[in-house]
Structure formats: structure tokens, C-alpha cells
């Protein structure tokens, strides 16, 4: 059976604000199965934002594990992400998971990759998923040439990705932290 795939998740940080957004499309092969999925969430009492791309079941499995790590490390995003990455690399079942996460709190944005890497993106911009390159390019241009708020940059970047990537729609969920 084919895997569910395709989405765009993008995060932008400027000053004391961070925004994380994603589209709502879930695709199975060349069929849109759902257009209103919620791939961006607030976790850890609303203090951490997380967005996921990749296989839906795998992403939920990772999200559950990440939430447990946040609890274990009392909300320390970096320690939770690194510990999740260690598990991801060393556990046979986890190594097979096909998903990626972007996580953000008030101070830090991290990308947790399908290889178990934890990346701190440059320039306050991170994007993943099938439309990630489009969204990241758009966000970078907007951040360098406008004074738009992070939420507005995320919305415009997702709109552009939705126009270019067939696996991305324009039903957005955008969350912010200040």
C-alpha cells in the first residue's frame, strides 16, 4: 500500500515572535484523501509549537514520543529533541519511521529529521515537506525585503507553496508564540 505523504510546514522567527504553519492536505498516491488535516499543534501547555510532515502514522508516533521527552526534560526543547534523536537512531522500529518535525518555543526553533538529526536552522526560517523548498525560499525573500510579522510571512510562504506544489493546499493552520 502507498504511504500518505505531501505537505508543507514552515516556521519563521523575528524578534520575540515565532510562527509555525502548515497546510491541511493529506495525499495517498495521486488522490487527496483529506484537505483539512491539522499538522501544526501546540503542546506542553501551549509553550511549544510542533509541525510534522511525512507519513501520518509515523508523525503521530514521533509527536507522542516528543511530548513525553518534553515532559521528562521539563520543557527544555533542545534536550527533548536530542534525546528523541538518540532514540530515533538507536531503535530499530523508530529508524523506519518516515516523518520530520519542526519544533519551536520562545527561544529556539529545531528541525528533527528522518535520519535522527537535530538542526538549528539559519536565519530563523525552517521548512519541511514536499513544498518546503518553495515555502523556505518565499519566507527568506520576505524576511530579507519586508518588515512583515512572522505570522504574515508564514501565511504568504504557504500560499506560494500551495500554488506551486501539488501536495500542498491553502487550508492553513498557523500558530504563534511571543
Curated annotation (Swiss-Prot):
Give details on activation and inhibition: Allosterically activated by HslU binding.
Query: Looking at the keywords, is Protease present?
Result: yes
Q: Where in the cell is it found?
A: Cytoplasm
Q: Which Gene3D superfamilies match?
A: Glutamine Phosphoribosylpyrophosphate, subunit 1, domain 1
Sorted UniProt keywords? Allosteric enzyme, Cytoplasm, Hydrolase, Metal-binding, Protease, Sodium, Threonine protease
Q: Which GO terms describe its cellular component?
A: HslUV protease complex; proteasome core complex
**Organism domain of life:** Bacteria
A Pfam short name: Proteasome
For the protein in the UniProt heading, the enzyme class is hydrolase
Enzyme Commission numbers on file: 3.4.25.2
Q: Name one GO biological process term.
A: proteolysis involved in protein catabolic process
Binding residue positions for Na(+):
162, 165, 168
Which reaction equation describes what this protein catalyses? Answer: ATP-dependent cleavage of peptide bonds with broad specificity
A single GO molecular-function term is: threonine-type endopeptidase activity
The active site consists of 7
Q: What does the protein in this record do?
A: Protease subunit of a proteasome-like degradation complex believed to be a general protein degrading machinery.
Name the family.
Belongs to the peptidase T1B family. HslV subfamily.
Subunit info here reads: A double ring-shaped homohexamer of HslV is capped on each side by a ring-shaped HslU homohexamer. The assembly of the HslU/HslV complex is dependent on binding of ATP.
Q: What protein name is recorded for this chain?
A: ATP-dependent protease subunit HslV
Q: From which organism does this entry originate?
A: Cupriavidus taiwanensis (strain DSM 17343 / BCRC 17206 / CCUG 44338 / CIP 107171 / LMG 19424 / R1) (Ralstonia taiwanensis (strain LMG 19424))
Amino acid at each position: 500500500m502507498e504511504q500518505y505523504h505531501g505537505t508543507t510546514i514552515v516556521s519563521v522567527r523575528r524578534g520575540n515572535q515565532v510562527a509555525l504553519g502548515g497546510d491541511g492536505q493529506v495525499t495517498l498516491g495521486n488522490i487527496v484523501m483529506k484537505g483539512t488535516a491539522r499538522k501544526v499543534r501546540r503542546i506542553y501547555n501551549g509553550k511549544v509549537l510542533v509541525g510534522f510532515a511525512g507519513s501520518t502514522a509515523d508523525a503521530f508516533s514521533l509527536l507522542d514520543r516528543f511530548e513525553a521527552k518534553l515532559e521528562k526534560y521539563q520543557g527544555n526543547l533542545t534536550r527533548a529533541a536530542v534525546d528523541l534523536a538518540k532514540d530515533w537512531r538507536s531503535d530499530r522500529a523508530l529508524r523506519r519511521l518516515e516523518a520530520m518535525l519542526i519544533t519551536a518555543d520562545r527561544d529556539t526553533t529545531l528541525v528533527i529529521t528522518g535520519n535522527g538529526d537535530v538542526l538549528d536552522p539559519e536565519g530563523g526560517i525552517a521548512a519541511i515537506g514536499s513544498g518546503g523548498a518553495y515555502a523556505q525560499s518565499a519566507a527568506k525573500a520576505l524576511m530579507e525585503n519586508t518588515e512583515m510579522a512572522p505570522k504574515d510571512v508564514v501565511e504568504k510562504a504557504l500560499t506560494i507553496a500551495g500554488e506551486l506544489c501539488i501536495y500542498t493546499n491553502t487550508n492553513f493552520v498557523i500558530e504563534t508564540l511571543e
